[in-house]
């Protein structure tokens, strides 16, 4: 039984686990991508590995792109100020 658990654990480590989340895709300095059209956001999100994206009109950060199932390696907007350069 212990052998089966160890083999399963080793396989899990070797294959890795890709996790995803939903959120506003972020520019550098914690700024959300502004939008007017769903097509812009869908293209942006899917090019960054998300399942789909759309323009969230009048959302928490104004008109901004919301991505569904965005990979963890792509930054999302987090609470706090946007600091454009």
Curated annotation (Swiss-Prot):
Q: Which cysteines are joined by disulfide bonds?
A: 31-82, 35-55, 41-65, 45-67
Q: Which domain of life is it from?
A: Eukaryota
Q: Does the keyword Acyltransferase apply?
A: no
Q: Tell me where in or outside the cell this protein is found.
A: Secreted
Q: Keyword Secreted on this protein?
A: yes
GO cellular component terms listed in the entry, alphabetical order: extracellular region
As given in the record, the signal peptide range reads 1-19
Q: What GO biological process terms does the UniProt entry carry, in alphabetical order?
A: defense response
Where does the LCN-type CS-alpha/beta domain lie? Answer: 21-83
- Write the record's keywords in alphabetical order, separated by commas: Disulfide bond, Ion channel impairing toxin, Neurotoxin, Secreted, Signal, Toxin, Voltage-gated sodium channel impairing toxin
Give the principal location in a single coarse category: secreted
Entry GO MF terms: sodium channel inhibitor activity; toxin activity
Tissue specificity note: Expressed by the venom gland.
Function of the molecule: Alpha toxins bind voltage-independently at site-3 of sodium channels (Nav) and inhibit the inactivation of the activated channels, thereby blocking neuronal transmission.
Family, according to the entry, reads as follows: Belongs to the long (4 C-C) scorpion toxin superfamily. Sodium channel inhibitor family. Alpha subfamily.
Give the domain section of the comments. Has the structural arrangement of an alpha-helix connected to antiparallel beta-sheets by disulfide bonds (CS-alpha/beta).
Q: What is this protein called?
A: Toxin BmKaTx10
Its lineage opens with:
Eukaryota, Metazoa, Ecdysozoa, Arthropoda, Chelicerata
């Amino acid at each position: 039984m212990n052998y089966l658990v160890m083999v399963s654990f080793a396989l899990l480590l070797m294959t890795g686990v890709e996790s995803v989340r939903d959120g506003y895709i972020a520019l550098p300095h914690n700024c959300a991508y502004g939008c007017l059209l769903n097509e812009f956001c869908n293209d942006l999100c899917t090019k960054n590995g998300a399942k789909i994206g759309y323009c969230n009109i009048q959302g928490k950060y104004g008109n901004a792109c919301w991505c569904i199932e965005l990979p963890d390696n792509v930054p999302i907007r987090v609470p706090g100020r946007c600091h454009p350069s």
